[in-house]
Regions:
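Intrinsically disordered, low-complexity terminal regions
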Residues: 1-254
Length: 254
């Protein structure tokens, strides 16, 4: 190997070493910039979780413990967070706790609650996920963009709403229950048992894209030039209302 080759090889090795050091410190900075909050609260079986986020993903999972576990991962600039335990309700309100602050990083939550909890969560932007909950209420609201995924839900009252994004519900329909799903643009998919009893109003005014699947019985009819479906399955004890302005609505047999 001549002198020029050795020089070129040395320069390449030095460049690789410098890039490795830069990557290491950049990764360390990113990790250190993320702040974590973790706390566990004692809870009754019928506890209520009320969470208002600004931006970020919220995941709520039911578990077989009489306590609520809250883990929050805060990106820089870290948000202020002051959870409260008020008469059987755990309240977390990042909008209130950060009033007057122009810049606040995303906050991603992983929360575990008793199976029989009521869950009321909302965010301005980000995904909302709830699974394995069978309390009186499950409410998920996104004021701008994000997907809502509700899995293995057995609540009597369910409300899911966003502007842009998909909504997926997988669960049972309770007698006398109320279920409302609303989106402006995205896909709404409802996966429910075939023997569910409910009155239905489903509206897709722009796309007319409503698929009833196995639920397209004689008790259902399309009206308003296909923009709406009204009807009843079984004894109609529950109520399901679905509105999707510029997206699809689909029913799937569970």
């Amino acid at each position: 190997m001549n002198w020029n080759s050795r020089k070129t090889s040395a320069v390449k090795k030095a460049a690789i070493l410098i890039l490795s050091v830069v990557f290491f410190f950049a990764s360390s900075t990113a990790i250190s910039a993320q702040k974590k909050f973790a706390k566990t609260y004692p809870a009754s079986k019928n506890v209520r979780l009320q969470l208002t986020n600004r931006t970020g993903t919220v995941t709520v999972e039911g578990w077989d413990k009489s306590e609520i576990s809250v883990a929050a991962y805060m990106e820089a600039p870290a948000a202020n967070m002051e959870p409260q335990s008020l008469s059987g309700t755990i309240v977390i309100n990042l909008v209130k706790d950060n009033q007057g602050r122009n810049e606040v990083g995303n906050v991603n939550f992983l929360i575990k609650v008793p199976y029989s909890s009521s869950v009321d969560i909302e965010t301005r932007m980000g995904n909302l996920n709830v699974s394995n909950v069978r309390g009186g209420l499950v409410r998920a609201h996104i004021s701008s963009e994000g997907d809502i995924t509700l899995t293995n839900i057995a609540a009597e009252n369910v409300a899911a709403e966003n502007l842009i994004g998909d909504i997926f519900f997988d669960g049972t329909i309770s007698e006398s229950g109320n279920y409302r799903f609303t989106s402006t643009r995205g896909n709404i998919n409802l996966r429910i048992p075939f023997d569910s009893s409910f009155k239905l109003i489903a509206t897709a005014p722009s796309t007319r894209n409503i698929s009833l699947g196995d639920f397209g019985s004689a008790g259902m009819r399309f009206v308003s030039d296909g923009r709406r479906v009204v009807g009843q399955a079984g004894d109609g004890s529950a109520t399901i209302a679905v509105t999707n302005q510029r997206g699809s609505i689909s029913f799937i047999r569970r």
